[in-house]
Amino acid sequence: IMKYEVESVADRMGEVLAHDFKQLPAVRDDGERTVLLGLAREEGLSAILEALEGEGILVASSVPAPLAIYGAWELVSTKADLDSPDDDLVLIADLGRSSLDVALVLNNRLVFARSTTFGGDQFTEALAQDLGAEMGQAEVVKKQRGGVTEGAKGVDERTIRPLRTAAGQLLGMLESSIRVGGSQAGVKLPGVTRLWFSGGGMRLKGLPRYLS
């Protein structure tokens, strides 16, 4: 079944795909198990590995980014109390320059993970368009004086509206991930009880609080 899925996606993309899969520990409401399938463009992955080897770094194995952030969470986070009668749903989100990696953890078990094309560049683009500036200039303004919270120290008020627009898009994508995650995992998810943010994009002033 996994081979068919990989071949189907590869045919649509017209590219050779590196792939792997794992069965998730959480049991679906119908008693079945969910299989998480990871895909990557083989050409792009090979280029990265070759560049690392050129610097003397040998990579034993590659891990999809959403699983990597779950691994980081599992290593350093406070785990849910499984004796508690209440469910614990953690939303993990890593916002990079051009990617958003999301994982959902229900009662310490991974139930969903995915990567989408959205990142800090979208915030910079929104700011550049609103200010009529070049991307490089907007990036500097975003890092030094940008923010989504009115009255915040060091935030230029002119940056708030465009950056908040991008933040609204990000919030919508996270909410969508929760809906899709519950559907694909085949479980009824409770409300999010904890948020775990990482990535350079999350350093924008006021963004974590806005998303909360």
Predicted regions and their residues:
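Phosphate-interacting basic helix/loop segments used at nucleotide- and nucleic-acid interfaces
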Residues: 73-88, 173-182
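Helical "lid/coupling" subdomains associated with nucleotide-phosphate turnover
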Residues: 150-212
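Phosphate- and divalent-cation-binding pockets in alpha/beta enzyme and binding domains
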Residues: 47, 69-72, 101, 206-210
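Gly/Thr-rich phosphate-binding beta-strand-loop-beta motif of the actin/hexokinase/Hsp70
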Residues: 31, 79-112, 122, 127
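Active-site neighborhood for divalent-cation/phosphate handling
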Residues: 1-80, 194
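Glycine-rich phosphate-binding loop plus the immediately following alpha-helix
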Residues: 46-71, 107-151
